[in-house]
C-alpha cells in the first residue's frame, strides 16, 4: 500500500487558509475629513459646553467668572477662524481675475514709465498723474480687502463695451464701491502704510508689506451680485479675453504666476 502524504495536504490547507484570510482582510476605512474647516467644530463644541455650564443657576461665582472669560475667548477664536476661511475662499475664487488684471496694470505702468523718460512740460505732468493712478490700481489688486468680494478694475461692460440699461444701476453702485476702496488705497499710500512703488515689490511673496489698517466695513452694504463683476464664477472666460493682451506697447515682461500669490499674503 502506497504511503499517504498528509504533510503536503496540510501545507496546501494552510496556504489556502492564509489566502482566504488575506482576501477577507478589511481594507482601511479612509473616512473623509469631517470638515474642511479645521478647528471650527471643536470651538463650537467647546462653546456649547461653556454655555451649558453658565446656564446652571447654582454655579459658584468664581466658576462663573472663569466660564465667562472662557466664553469670550472662544467667541473671539471662532470669529478669527471664520474670517480666515472666508479670506481663503475669496482668494481662491478671485485668483484668476486678479492675476490677469495685475498683468494688464503692470504692462500699462511700465509703458507710462518708459514714456516719462523722454517727456517734458505738460506731457510729463500728465504722465506722472497717470503713473500714480496705475500704482493705485496695482496696490488695489495686491492689497484688496481680504473679506470683501473682489470688484474688478475692468468689468465685462468696460472690456467688451456692452452696457445695457439693466446693468447701469448695478454699475453705478459697483463704481462707487470701487472708488471708495481706491480712495482708501490712496490714503494708505500717502500714510506710507502701502508702498508708493508697488511694482518694485512684485514677486516678493509673503514679505510684501500689507496695509496696517483695515478697510472700514459697512454693515448695511451688501456685495453686488447682479453685475458681471460679481458673477458666481468670476474669470471663467478671462483667459480668452483679448482686452488683457491688446496693449499697444507690450514690454514682453509679463508677471509670472506665483503659487498662492495675493491670497497667501
Swiss-Prot record:
Coiled coil: 55-121
Composition skew (Basic and acidic residues), residue ranges: 185-195
Feature: compositional bias, Basic residues: 21-30
Compartment(s) where it occurs, according to its Swiss-Prot or TrEMBL record: Nucleus, Nucleolus
Organism superkingdom: Eukaryota
Biased amino acid composition, Acidic residues: 237-265
A GO cellular-component term linked to this record: nucleolus
Keywords per UniProt: Coiled coil, Nucleus, rRNA processing
Biological processes annotated in GO: maturation of SSU-rRNA from tricistronic rRNA transcript (SSU-rRNA, 5.8S rRNA, LSU-rRNA)
One Pfam family recorded for the sequence: Efg1
Name assigned to this protein: rRNA-processing protein EFG1
Polar residues: compositionally biased ranges: 210-233
InterPro entries, alphabetized: Efg1, EFG1_rRNA-proc
Region called Disordered, residue ranges: 1-46, 161-180, 185-265
Main location group: nucleus
Gene field: EFG1
General function of this protein: Involved in rRNA processing.
Family (UniProt): Belongs to the EFG1 family.
Amino acid at each position: 500500500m502506497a504511503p499517504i502524504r498528509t504533510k503536503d495536504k496540510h501545507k496546501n490547507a494552510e496556504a489556502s487558509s492564509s489566502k482566504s484570510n488575506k482576501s477577507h482582510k478589511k481594507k482601511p476605512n479612509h473616512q473623509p475629513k469631517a470638515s474642511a474647516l479645521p478647528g471650527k467644530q471643536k470651538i463650537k463644541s467647546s462653546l456649547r459646553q461653556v454655555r451649558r455650564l453658565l446656564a446652571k443657576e447654582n454655579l459658584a461665582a468664581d466658576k462663573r467668572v472663569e466660564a465667562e472669560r472662557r466664553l469670550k475667548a472662544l467667541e473671539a477664536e471662532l470669529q478669527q477662524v471664520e474670517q480666515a476661511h472666508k479670506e481663503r475662499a475669496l482668494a481662491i475664487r478671485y485668483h484668476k481675475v486678479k492675476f490677469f488684471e495685475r498683468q494688464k496694470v503692470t504692462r500699462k505702468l511700465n509703458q507710462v514709465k518708459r514714456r516719462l523718460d523722454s517727456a517734458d512740460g505738460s506731457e510729463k505732468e500728465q504722465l506722472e498723474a497717470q503713473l500714480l493712478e496705475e500704482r493705485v490700481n496695482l496696490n488695489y489688486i495686491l492689497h484688496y480687502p481680504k473679506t470683501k468680494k473682489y470688484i474688478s478694475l475692468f468689468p465685462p461692460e468696460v472690456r467688451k463695451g456692452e452696457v445695457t440699461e439693466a446693468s447701469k444701476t448695478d454699475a453705478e453702485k459697483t463704481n462707487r464701491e470701487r472708488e471708495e476702496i481706491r480712495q482708501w488705497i490712496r490714503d494708505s499710500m500717502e500714510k506710507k502704510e502701502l508702498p508708493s512703488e508697488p511694482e518694485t515689490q512684485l514677486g516678493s511673496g509673503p514679505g510684501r508689506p500689507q496695509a496696517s489698517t483695515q478697510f472700514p466695513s459697512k454693515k448695511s452694504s451688501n456685495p453686488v451680485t447682479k453685475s458681471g463683476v460679481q458673477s458666481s464664477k468670476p474669470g471663467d472666460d478671462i483667459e480668452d479675453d483679448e482686452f488683457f493682451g491688446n496693449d499697444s506697447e507690450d514690454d514682453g515682461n509679463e508677471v509670472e504666476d506665483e503659487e498662492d500669490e495675493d491670497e497667501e499674503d
